[in-house]
Amino acid sequence: MSIENLKSFDPFADTGDDETATSNYIHIRIQQRNGRKTLTTVQGVPEEYDLKRILKVLKKDFACNGNIVKDPEMGEIIQLQGDQRAKVCEFMISQLGLQKKNIKIHGF
């Protein structure tokens, strides 16, 4: 006979809070620059996609400038000028075939 109630349980912990589950999300964030200027950052794009080609299409479709930044902790991040969060989310779903549940939009 085993006693099952001796396990530690945190009632305030988020359900499904593991490191592997958070790594498969695509995070779209907005950052404030000078005054009204903003940057949109896209982090966590899966490895099978070519970030340079995605950036080229995003820049052309949204008529904005952008670049790819290499971060030691976060990996490669796409930066776009302006608030492009909704457009990037729609692009990821329609063009890349990603699911909306895997995309997190942060900011304001």
UniProtKB/Swiss-Prot annotation:
GO biological process, one term: maintenance of translational fidelity
Keyword annotations of the record: Acetylation, Protein biosynthesis, Translation regulation
Keyword set includes Acetylation: yes
GO cellular component: eukaryotic 43S preinitiation complex; multi-eIF complex
Subunit structure: The factors eIF-1, eIF-2, eIF-3, TIF5/eIF-5 and methionyl-tRNAi form a multifactor complex (MFC) that may bind to the 40S ribosome. Interacts with NIP1.
PANTHER family attached to this UniProt entry: EUKARYOTIC TRANSLATION INITIATION FACTOR SUI1 (PTHR10388)
Gene field: SUI1
Organism (species): Saccharomyces cerevisiae (strain ATCC 204508 / S288c)
The protein, known as: Eukaryotic translation initiation factor eIF-1
InterPro entries registered for this protein in UniProt: SUI1 (IPR001950), SUI1_dom_sf (IPR036877), SUI1_euk (IPR005874)
A Gene Ontology molecular function term of the record: translation initiation factor activity
